[in-house]
Amino acid sequence: MAVRIRLAKFGRKHHPIYRIVVMDAKSPREGKYIDILGTYDPKRKVLINVYPEKVKEWVLKGVELSHRAKAILWNHGILKEVVPEGYEMKRVGDYYVFEKRESKKSKGGEAA
């Protein structure tokens, strides 16, 4: 089961609001979600609320991020503060994953 952090639309007519949620990759946009990480208002371009500890928890579990969810969390500084030292963002197809960075010493040791 592939799990992703992505946006789920709700709100009213002509005023969409998106929840930043963790859900199965095959679920529809407004389908069942596993966890709510925050809320985003695109009209005002503000994060209404975000739970950085939940974002960090899911990122460390290896969850993929959709392009839009990654952009929103990165531009508002959430990903910068929750991603620990030694992790880097890698693009896997259309999605992003944080993985442990290999140290240069271990690479050099294998080559010698």
From Swiss-Prot:
Zinc in keyword set: no
Highest rank taxon of the organism: Bacteria
Pfam families, A to Z: Ribosomal_S16
GO molecular function: structural constituent of ribosome
Gene Ontology process terms (BP): translation
InterPro entries per the UniProt record, alphabetical: Ribosomal_bS16 (IPR000307), Ribosomal_bS16_dom_sf (IPR023803)
Record keywords, A-Z: Ribonucleoprotein, Ribosomal protein
Family named by the database record: Belongs to the bacterial ribosomal protein bS16 family.
Stated name of the protein: Small ribosomal subunit protein bS16
Organism of provenance: Aquifex aeolicus (strain VF5)
